[in-house]
Amino acid sequence: GGRMYRVILLGFFATLLQAKGTVRLDRDARPLLLVEDPETRLHPIMLSVAWHPLNLLPLQQITTTNSGELLSLTPVEHVCRLVRESSRVAAWRLGPSGMNADDGRRIAFHIRFNRASSLFARCWLLVEGETETWVINELARQCGHHFDAAGIKVIEFAQSGLKPLIKFARRMGIE
Protein backbone atom coordinates (compact mmCIF):
# COMPACT_ATOMS: atom_id res chain seq x y z
CA GLY A 1 0.00 0.00 0.00
CA GLY A 2 2.44 2.70 1.18
CA ARG A 3 5.18 1.79 -1.29
CA MET A 4 2.79 1.79 -4.25
CA TYR A 5 1.37 5.14 -3.09
CA ARG A 6 4.89 6.65 -3.08
CA VAL A 7 5.68 5.20 -6.53
CA ILE A 8 2.50 6.70 -7.99
CA LEU A 9 3.18 10.08 -6.38
CA LEU A 10 6.76 10.11 -7.69
CA GLY A 11 5.47 9.21 -11.15
CA PHE A 12 3.08 12.17 -11.03
CA PHE A 13 5.82 14.55 -9.97
CA ALA A 14 8.21 13.27 -12.65
CA THR A 15 5.55 13.72 -15.34
CA LEU A 16 4.68 17.22 -14.13
CA LEU A 17 8.33 18.28 -14.01
CA GLN A 18 8.93 16.89 -17.49
CA ALA A 19 5.86 18.72 -18.85
CA LYS A 20 6.93 21.97 -17.13
CA GLY A 21 10.32 21.87 -18.84
CA THR A 22 12.38 25.01 -18.28
CA VAL A 23 9.38 27.32 -17.91
CA ARG A 24 9.41 29.14 -14.59
CA LEU A 25 5.96 29.09 -13.01
CA ASP A 26 4.58 31.80 -10.78
CA ARG A 27 4.25 30.75 -7.17
CA ASP A 28 0.44 30.91 -7.37
CA ALA A 29 0.21 29.16 -10.75
CA ARG A 30 -2.13 26.20 -10.97
CA PRO A 31 -1.22 24.18 -14.07
CA LEU A 32 -4.02 22.49 -16.01
CA LEU A 33 -3.90 18.70 -16.07
CA LEU A 34 -5.99 16.86 -18.67
CA VAL A 35 -6.64 13.18 -17.95
CA GLU A 36 -8.47 11.12 -20.55
CA ASP A 37 -10.22 7.92 -19.48
CA PRO A 38 -7.70 6.81 -16.82
CA GLU A 39 -9.79 3.70 -16.15
CA THR A 40 -8.58 2.25 -19.48
CA ARG A 41 -5.03 2.03 -18.14
CA LEU A 42 -5.53 1.33 -14.44
CA HIS A 43 -7.20 -1.41 -12.45
CA PRO A 44 -10.09 0.05 -10.36
CA ILE A 45 -8.13 -0.38 -7.12
CA MET A 46 -5.05 1.31 -8.58
CA LEU A 47 -7.26 4.08 -9.97
CA SER A 48 -8.60 4.72 -6.48
CA VAL A 49 -5.09 4.67 -4.99
CA ALA A 50 -3.73 7.02 -7.67
CA TRP A 51 -6.61 9.46 -7.55
CA HIS A 52 -6.15 10.58 -3.95
CA PRO A 53 -2.60 12.01 -4.28
CA LEU A 54 -3.51 13.59 -7.62
CA ASN A 55 -6.22 15.61 -5.89
CA LEU A 56 -3.70 16.89 -3.33
CA LEU A 57 -1.57 18.60 -5.96
CA PRO A 58 -2.13 22.31 -6.69
CA LEU A 59 -3.61 21.70 -10.14
CA GLN A 60 -6.64 22.51 -12.20
CA GLN A 61 -7.94 19.23 -13.52
CA ILE A 62 -10.19 18.12 -16.36
CA THR A 63 -10.86 14.39 -16.57
CA THR A 64 -13.02 12.44 -18.98
CA THR A 65 -14.28 9.10 -17.76
CA ASN A 66 -16.78 6.32 -18.28
CA SER A 67 -16.04 4.93 -14.82
CA GLY A 68 -18.61 4.94 -12.05
CA GLU A 69 -15.73 4.03 -9.74
CA LEU A 70 -13.91 7.25 -10.58
CA LEU A 71 -17.11 9.29 -10.30
CA SER A 72 -17.62 7.94 -6.78
CA LEU A 73 -14.27 9.51 -5.83
CA THR A 74 -15.33 12.94 -7.11
CA PRO A 75 -17.62 15.36 -5.25
CA VAL A 76 -20.82 15.81 -7.28
CA GLU A 77 -20.37 19.59 -7.36
CA HIS A 78 -17.17 19.01 -9.38
CA VAL A 79 -18.83 16.74 -11.96
CA CYS A 80 -19.82 18.10 -15.36
CA ARG A 81 -22.00 15.83 -17.54
CA LEU A 82 -21.60 16.22 -21.28
CA VAL A 83 -24.71 15.16 -23.20
CA ARG A 84 -24.67 14.81 -26.97
CA GLU A 85 -27.75 16.36 -28.52
CA SER A 86 -28.69 16.49 -32.20
CA SER A 87 -26.88 19.76 -32.96
CA ARG A 88 -24.59 20.32 -29.97
CA VAL A 89 -23.03 18.93 -26.83
CA ALA A 90 -24.73 20.25 -23.69
CA ALA A 91 -22.81 20.65 -20.42
CA TRP A 92 -24.66 20.10 -17.14
CA ARG A 93 -23.28 20.65 -13.66
CA LEU A 94 -24.50 21.19 -10.16
CA GLY A 95 -21.89 23.74 -9.17
CA PRO A 96 -20.81 24.72 -5.66
CA SER A 97 -24.16 26.24 -4.62
CA GLY A 98 -26.39 23.69 -6.31
CA MET A 99 -27.96 22.06 -3.23
CA ASN A 100 -28.35 22.78 0.46
CA ALA A 101 -26.13 20.85 2.88
CA ASP A 102 -28.76 18.25 3.84
CA ASP A 103 -29.80 17.46 0.25
CA GLY A 104 -26.15 17.46 -0.82
CA ARG A 105 -25.33 14.89 1.86
CA ARG A 106 -28.25 12.69 0.77
CA ILE A 107 -27.25 12.87 -2.89
CA ALA A 108 -23.59 12.23 -2.07
CA PHE A 109 -24.51 9.05 -0.21
CA HIS A 110 -27.35 7.82 -2.40
CA ILE A 111 -25.92 8.63 -5.84
CA ARG A 112 -22.19 9.35 -5.56
CA PHE A 113 -21.22 6.52 -3.21
CA ASN A 114 -23.82 3.87 -4.05
CA ARG A 115 -24.99 4.54 -7.62
CA ALA A 116 -22.30 6.63 -9.30
CA SER A 117 -22.82 4.90 -12.66
CA SER A 118 -26.39 6.28 -12.68
CA LEU A 119 -24.84 9.64 -13.63
CA PHE A 120 -24.24 8.16 -17.10
CA ALA A 121 -27.97 7.44 -17.59
CA ARG A 122 -30.10 9.64 -19.83
CA CYS A 123 -33.21 9.01 -17.76
CA TRP A 124 -34.06 7.94 -14.22
CA LEU A 125 -37.24 6.11 -13.28
CA LEU A 126 -37.77 7.05 -9.64
CA VAL A 127 -39.54 4.39 -7.59
CA GLU A 128 -40.25 4.21 -3.87
CA GLY A 129 -38.19 1.25 -2.74
CA GLU A 130 -36.28 -1.95 -3.42
CA THR A 131 -39.35 -4.04 -4.30
CA GLU A 132 -40.46 -1.58 -6.98
CA THR A 133 -36.93 -1.50 -8.37
CA TRP A 134 -36.94 -5.29 -8.79
CA VAL A 135 -40.47 -5.37 -10.23
CA ILE A 136 -39.94 -2.54 -12.77
CA ASN A 137 -36.65 -4.01 -13.99
CA GLU A 138 -38.16 -7.49 -14.32
CA LEU A 139 -41.30 -6.24 -16.11
CA ALA A 140 -39.15 -4.30 -18.55
CA ARG A 141 -36.98 -7.36 -19.20
CA GLN A 142 -40.02 -9.58 -19.80
CA CYS A 143 -41.44 -6.99 -22.22
CA GLY A 144 -38.18 -6.95 -24.17
CA HIS A 145 -36.96 -3.55 -22.98
CA HIS A 146 -33.28 -3.19 -22.15
CA PHE A 147 -32.99 -0.29 -19.74
CA ASP A 148 -29.19 -0.25 -19.75
CA ALA A 149 -29.03 -0.04 -23.55
CA ALA A 150 -31.64 2.74 -23.52
CA GLY A 151 -29.76 4.74 -20.88
CA ILE A 152 -32.47 4.23 -18.25
CA LYS A 153 -31.70 3.64 -14.58
CA VAL A 154 -34.27 2.70 -11.94
CA ILE A 155 -33.52 4.61 -8.72
CA GLU A 156 -35.35 4.14 -5.43
CA PHE A 157 -36.00 7.30 -3.48
CA ALA A 158 -37.12 6.00 -0.06
CA GLN A 159 -33.72 6.63 1.56
CA SER A 160 -32.87 9.98 0.01
CA GLY A 161 -36.24 11.60 -0.61
CA LEU A 162 -37.89 12.37 -3.93
CA LYS A 163 -37.32 16.14 -4.07
CA PRO A 164 -33.49 16.07 -3.77
CA LEU A 165 -33.27 13.42 -6.50
CA ILE A 166 -35.54 15.35 -8.87
CA LYS A 167 -33.66 18.60 -8.25
CA PHE A 168 -30.31 16.89 -8.76
CA ALA A 169 -31.42 15.07 -11.93
CA ARG A 170 -32.76 18.28 -13.48
CA ARG A 171 -29.56 20.21 -12.69
CA MET A 172 -27.48 17.41 -14.22
CA GLY A 173 -29.57 17.08 -17.40
CA ILE A 174 -31.07 13.70 -16.52
CA GLU A 175 -34.70 13.24 -17.55
Predicted feature residues:
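Switch/communication elements of ASCE P-loop NTPase nucleotide-binding domains
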Residues: 1-114
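RecA-like P-loop NTPase motor core
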Residues: 58, 71-72, 77-174
